[in-house]
């Protein structure tokens, strides 16, 4: 007699470029036959690139709820909540698993109202510092604590994030928070590196002795591109190497970024804006260093993908960064908001091809098993089963 499948309704904020989309896609596509998964999500915000091509690449279909938007809105939130309840009524899930803040609020509210047996939430990052003022931040903490108390389980994507959620922000007790790191299809980043590098260098007109430095991510205040531009200004005065800087991404600060690029270009800096690049695996292979300057992060995907591409990395010390970079081995971790220290470490990588090569090789060894999606699937299946057992 066939065993009844465990039905999982997976709800994600929105299908934009980033870790949550990959995470939700792999968990929908690759769970074993013991599970049946339905994926639901909102659409990207204005200025964001959608990630529906990622779902298409892996043959995943999703239900789109256009009313589920990042910013709170009474009317659209109420419509989204009702649509989620309708989906739950029809699908009859054993587990509702929400990913990120808006999906976590609306999805869990719908699941509680509809008496879903097991309700799980993953924090892909959090908004408890560097996003809002004190009053709004405290309100969000209050809401998250209330939701966490009713949830069957809470997932953090790094050990540091678990500590922040439990000890600093008091969202839930540490023993109720399970750490399950993200997982990715990393092999595509590591294959045919020489051919991919040659293609990108040719496409962008880069010579052999050019050092290509990129920052990849949403053009939003939290990503702190302003710090990156400060670093560029310091660097250009302190090396004779031929440098080319790339800004990859898009978002609300696009006009600011374009103005800064125009200014730096007038000062003789070769700096280029690409918007989003879909084939990031090929692009990465052509880079020499990939940077992250964020004020706050969960687990920054661009840094994992860079190391899978055997590219050296440098990042501010935020969120789960220490869980994904082997400091002084695959890259450098520096204090946030300190352009001088960041520039000094970046100069080491600029000046030494041998260090870049060593860091790149170490990076691939560091991430290839730790962040592969097969590990993610195994961890999540075991966690789901344990929660189902607890519910019996």
Tell me what each language-model feature is.
Residues 276, 295:
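Aromatic "clamp/platform" in nucleotide-sugar-dependent glycosyltransferases that forms part
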Residues 50-54, 190-206:
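A short helix/loop element that forms part of the nucleotide-sugar donor recognition site in Leloir-type
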Residues 312-315, 325:
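Short hydrophobic beta-strand element within catalytic cores of glycosyltransferases
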Residues 258-275:
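Nucleotide-activated donor-binding/catalytic signature segment of Leloir-type glycosyltransferases, i.e.
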Residues 327-328, 332-339, 348-354:
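Conserved acidic donor-binding segment of nucleotide-sugar-dependent glycosyltransferases
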Residues 21-26, 211-234, 252-258, 340-341:
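A conserved mid-protein helix/loop that constitutes part of the nucleotide-sugar donor-binding site
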Residues 150-176, 184-188:
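A short, active-site helix/loop in glycosyltransferases that binds the activated sugar's phosphate group
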Residues 10-18, 22-76, 161-166, 252-254:
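N-terminal strand-loop element at the rim of the active site
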């Amino acid at each position: 007699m066939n065993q009844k499948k465990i039905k999982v309704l997976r709800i994600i904020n929105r299908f934009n470029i980033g870790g949550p989309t990959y995470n939700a896609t792999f968990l929908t596509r690759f769970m074993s036959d013991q599970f049946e998964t339905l994926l639901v999500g909102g659409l990207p915000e204005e200025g964001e690139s959608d990630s529906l091509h990622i779902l298409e690449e892996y043959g995943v279909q999703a239900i789109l709820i256009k009313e589920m938007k990042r910013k709170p809105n009474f009317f659209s939130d109420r419509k989204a909540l009702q649509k989620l309840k309708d989906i739950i009524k029809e699908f009859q899930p054993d587990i509702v698993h929400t990913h990120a803040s808006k999906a976590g609020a609306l999805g869990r509210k719908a699941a509680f109202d509809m008496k879903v047996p097991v309700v799980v939430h993953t924090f892909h990052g959090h908004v408890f510092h560097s996003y809002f003022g004190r009053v709004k931040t405290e309100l969000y903490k209050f809401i998250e604590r209330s939701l966490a108390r009713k949830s069957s389980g809470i997932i953090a994507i790094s050990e540091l994030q678990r500590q922040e959620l439990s000890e600093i922000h008091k969202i839930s007790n540490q023993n109720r928070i399970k750490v399950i790191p993200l997982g990715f299809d990393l092999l595509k980043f590591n294959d045919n590196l020489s051919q991919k590098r040659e293609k990108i260098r040719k496409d962008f007109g880069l010579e052999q002795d050019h050092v290509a430095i990129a920052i990849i991510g949403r053009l939003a205040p939290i990503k702190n591109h302003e710090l990156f531009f400060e670093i560029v200004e310091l660097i250009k005065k302190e090396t004779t190497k031929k440098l080319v800087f790339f800004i990859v991404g898009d978002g609300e600060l696009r006009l600011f970024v374009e103005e800064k690029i125009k200014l730096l270009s007038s000062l003789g800096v070769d700096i280029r804006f690409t918007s989003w690049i879909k084939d990031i695996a090929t692009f990465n292979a052509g880079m020499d260093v990939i940077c992250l300057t964020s004020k706050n992060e969960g687990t920054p995907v661009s840094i994992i993908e860079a190391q899978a591409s055997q590219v050296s990395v440098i990042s501010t010390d935020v969120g789960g960064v220490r869980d994904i970079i082997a400091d002084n081995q695959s890259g450098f971790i520096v204090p946030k908001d300190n352009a001088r220290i960041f520039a000094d470490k970046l100069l080491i990588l600029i000046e030494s091809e041998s260090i870049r090569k060593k860091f790149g090789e170490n990076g691939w060894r560091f991430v290839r098993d730790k962040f592969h999606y097969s590990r993610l699937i195994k961890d999540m299946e075991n966690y789901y089963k344990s929660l189902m057992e607890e519910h019996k």
